[in-house]
A protein has these predicted regions:
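Glycine-rich phosphate-binding loops of nucleotide-dependent enzymes
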Residues: 2-183
Length: 183
């Protein structure tokens, strides 16, 4: 699906995320200068640019890891300040990071549980991990310890963790950079 295709051409357009005039500076360095765009439900977008162009900086602002110096982020038609990754997840924004962060001593299911609301048993979560990884063909064992997994397997854990949050908007910052061609 491209950005111009919609799952149902008869449905009204629904803008999930809009950004207007987003700027971010680090001292004298400008990472983002007057960035603006819209993402509608069902669309797929890619941010393209060379290393250091500000792509990761921008998605970190959308996910609440950084705050813009100026400009506005609009979520589902309402201006919003995304204060933290937790706030982003509460809004329905999920992110798979280029440089992921997993607790090496924990199992896959235990790591995934840390990103989800409390209350679900590890047994039930493990079943959901198995189902999700089977649905997408990415083979994640919920009982495996992270320190026993390859880097590619750890990245697949990150992807499943994000998908299990059922985000309305999924941001992926070079999620396949550590995967082999077969993965």
């Amino acid at each position: 699906m491209t950005g111009s295709q919609r799952p149902d051409e008869t449905s009204p357009r629904t803008t999930l995320l809009a950004a207007t005039g987003i700027c971010k500076h680090f001292g004298d360095f400008t990472a983002n200068d007057d960035v603006g765009f819209e993402i509608e439900a069902g669309e797929i977008h890619a941010l393209l640019g060379e290393n250091g162009a500000g792509k990761s900086t921008f998605v970190k602002m959308v996910y609440g890891l950084l705050q813009p110096d100026s400009g506005q982020i609009i979520w589902r038609g309402e201006p919003v300040t995304i204060r933290s990754p937790q706030h982003a997840r509460e809004l329905g924004i999920g992110m798979v990071f280029q440089h992921f962060s997993l607790f090496q001593a924990l199992t896959v299911a235990e790591n995934i549980a840390l990103a989800l609301p409390p209350g679900e048993s590890l047994e039930d979560l493990s079943e959901r991990v198995r189902a999700m990884s089977a649905e997408y063909g990415i083979g994640v064992d919920p009982d495996a310890r992270i320190h026993n997994l390859s880097v590619g397997e750890q990245q697949r854990v990150e992807i499943v963790r994000c998908l299990l949050q059922d985000p309305s908007l999924l941001i992926m910052d070079e999620p396949t950079s550590v995967l082999t061609p077969q993965e």
